[in-house]
């Protein structure tokens, strides 16, 4: 079968990398339900675009629209992968996954778990013994169970942490029910275990941030309006964006959220490729507390929860300011119904202070140019935390990836007056929040002036001949194989890494390059023999470089949910020790936040910035922003006022 003209119009596909539309998702589900997934027991984990091969895209050949689907058959308690040809109407591949593989959770499975816990007789009775009888105020928060050496016998499990509210709008995180965990089997559809250990008094002090609890808002801050009277400087055609010298395509997947494709920079009229594909690959949040419940908190928010599905519908004026372009995100619920996250991705421009300036004191003249950046973002809510993910593109060719962490701490209970060395007391009523980390990995499929790239490590070194003691230099070392490219940051050596193209030379006959500035380059704090370290080995180092393989997509492997970490992921792929010199390669950078909790993080956390920079390093022959015009501002009378020129 092929899509008819009416369906094609609904699909709205203009490029092979465009995400699947709702029509295409519905079609893929229908094809699967008419075929191998006909049974009512099947649940859909994800249906997304099967991206064409890079060779086909470069060649410009016609490619079929295909969908990758992941499903679970609850009756068999087994998982499957499928490839669907949307134009032919066929299932081209149907693969039974290994018995121990558990795909990510779906959003409606979280609601299913909470509802089942609230109705379970054993749970109700156990809570009643703790004096909690109004189940409408009890909140069950499903987490992944992780892996701690146990045999879960192929069961697809969630573990629910439990909190309680004083009233409907009260923050439940102020009132954790400690040492009380409910295990729910999604395939069996029932509670299978209850861990009800030492009861600790539920903290009663509130921790609310809603206006009705906080009181009147301050009135001394005057309006700060963002105006662009001539509109935004970007042009959008479908999912293709051009802005200043940048061009790229916007993508969205249930697993990664925002994806950037075919990132190019126009230099002297030529579109030069920089990165073929860039996205969040994985993240893990391990907790450092030894308390029984807290010690098993280590969520892989991308690989276990499909963080793209948790994207917010963004609101003008609150999440993004200025002239905004939104992109919707399409996904599927567990029953195969397409659904849309409206305004899942936000794109806008921001002023970014000065870009360059010089005052010629001899002539008494100054030249200043202001910077601006293009911001492409999405924000995901993962239970208590919010993660805002940003790609920033700058006029000088720089790129920034930034995570802004906010939301509410994951809290725990202790006896009033206790001081837990593994966390911060938030009040004197027994509430604390454990120390933890937020570890992120970003995958960047570089294509710097072409496919054949290489990576250098650059360290500061002192020469042997150094009579004044002031000499130091930057020394490049080529990373030749995957094993040699497993690296850690080193601030003492001012280390950074360069991605270069030996076949493309700049003005001084050096390979063109970009450099990765490894800010926030922390590593996993857990011991190497800890289960979370074995599962999140990507977080034990900061830099990984692999030879391109389209099947190697996620740093902790394709399916980290309940996985041991022994079979998949960067640490497995790099054992091949493939050549990474003058070849198609992928750069993976791990960074994070070591979150030592403070009182100011409660009851809602001021955002914390975590990220890194990519900067051109000999990619251009000179500063590429010399052609920027002098800037103007608008006065209160509405007249243009030149704010960046001589004599002002």
Curated annotation (Swiss-Prot):
It catalyses: a primary methyl amine + O2 + H2O = an aldehyde + H2O2 + NH4(+). PROSITE patterns: COPPER_AMINE_OXID_1 (PS01164), COPPER_AMINE_OXID_2 (PS01165). InterPro entries: AGAO-like_N2, Cu_Am_Ox_Cu-bd, Cu_Am_ox_TPQ-bd, Cu_amine_oxidase, Cu_amine_oxidase_C, Cu_amine_oxidase_C_sf, Cu_amine_oxidase_N-reg, Cu_amine_oxidase_N3. It comes from the Bacteria. Residues 1-9 form a propeptide. GO terms for biological process: amine metabolic process. NCBIfam families: PRK11504.1. The exact function of MaoXI is not known. This is Primary amine oxidase. It comes from Arthrobacter sp. (strain P1). The gene is maoI.
């Amino acid at each position: 079968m092929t899509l008819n003209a009416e369906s094609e119009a609904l699909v709205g596909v203009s490029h092979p990398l465009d995400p699947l539309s709702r029509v295409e998702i519905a079609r893929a589900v229908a094809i699967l339900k008419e075929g191998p997934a006909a049974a009512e027991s099947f649940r859909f984990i994800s249906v997304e675009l099967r991206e064409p091969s890079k060779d086909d895209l470069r060649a410009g050949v016609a490619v079929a629209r295909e969908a990758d689907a992941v499903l679970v058959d609850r009756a068999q308690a087994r998982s499957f992968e499928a490839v669907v040809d949307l134009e032919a109407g066929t299932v081209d591949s149907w693969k039974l996954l290994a018995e121990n593989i558990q795909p990510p959770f779906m959003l409606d499975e979280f609601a299913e778990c909470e509802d089942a816990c609230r109705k379970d007789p054993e749970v109700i009775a156990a809570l009643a013994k703790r004096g909690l009888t109004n189940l409408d105020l009890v909140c069950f928060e499903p987490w992944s169970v992780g892996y701690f050496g146990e045999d879960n016998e192929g069961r697809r499990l969630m573990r629910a942490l439990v909190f309680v509210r004083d009233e409907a709008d009260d923050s439940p995180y102020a009132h954790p029910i400690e040492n009380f965990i409910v295990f729910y089997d999604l395939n069996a559809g029932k509670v299978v275990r209850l861990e009800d250990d030492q009861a600790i008094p539920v903290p009663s002090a509130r921790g609310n941030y809603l206006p009705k609890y906080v009181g009147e808002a301050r009135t001394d801050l005057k309006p700060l309006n963002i105006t662009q009277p001539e509109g935004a400087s970007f042009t959008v055609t479908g999912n293709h964006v051009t802005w200043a010298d940048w061009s790229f395509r916007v993508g969205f997947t249930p697993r990664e959220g925002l994806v950037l494709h075919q990132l190019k920079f126009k230099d002297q009229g030529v579109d030069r490729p920089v990165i073929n594909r860039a996205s969040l690959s994985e993240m893990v949040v391990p907790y450092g507390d030894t308390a029984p419940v807290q010690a098993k908190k280590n969520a892989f928010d991308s690989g276990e929860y499909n963080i793209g599905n948790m994207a917010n519908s963004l609101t003008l004026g609150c999440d993004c300011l200025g002239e905004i372009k939104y992109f919707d995100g399409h996904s599927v619920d567990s029953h195969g119904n397409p659904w849309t996250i409206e305004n899942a991705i936000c794109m806008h421009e921001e002023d970014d202070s000065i870009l360059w300036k010089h005052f010629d004191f001899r002539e008494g003249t100054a030249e200043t140019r202001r910077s601006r950046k293009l911001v492409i973002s999405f924000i995901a809510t993962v239970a208590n935390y919010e993660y805002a993910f940003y790609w920033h593109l700058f006029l000088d060719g720089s790129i920034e990836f930034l995570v802004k962490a906010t939301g509410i701490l994951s809290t725990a209970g202790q006896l009033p007056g206790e001081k837990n060395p593994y966390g911060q007391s938030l009040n004197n009523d027994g509430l604390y929040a454990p120390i933890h980390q937020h570890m992120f990995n970003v995958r960047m499929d570089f294509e710097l002036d072409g496919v054949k790239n290489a990576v250098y490590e650059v360290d500061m070194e002192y020469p042997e001949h150094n009579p004044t003691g002031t000499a130091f230099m930057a020394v490049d070392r080529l990373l030749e194989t995957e094993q040699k490219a497993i690296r850690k940051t080193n601030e003492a050596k001012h280390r950074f890494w360069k991605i270069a193209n030996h076949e493309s030379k700049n003005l001084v006959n050096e390979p063109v390059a970009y450099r990765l500035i490894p800010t926030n380059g922390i590593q996993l704090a857990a011991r190497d023999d800890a289960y979370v370290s074995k599962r999140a080995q990507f977080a034990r180092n900061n830099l990984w470089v692999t030879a391109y393989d389209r099947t190697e997509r996620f740093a902790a492997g394709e399916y980290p949910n309940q996985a041991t970490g022994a079979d998949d992921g960067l640490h497995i792929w790099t054992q091949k020790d493939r050549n990474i010199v003058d070849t198609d390669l992928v750069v993976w950078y791990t960074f994070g936040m070591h979150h030592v909790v403070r009182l100011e993080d409660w009851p809602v956390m001021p955002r914390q910035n975590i990220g890194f920079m990519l900067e051109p390093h000999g990619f251009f022959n000179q500063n590429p922003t010399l052609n920027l015009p002098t800037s103007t501002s608008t006065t209160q009378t509405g007249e243009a006022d030149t704010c960046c020129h001589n004599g002002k």
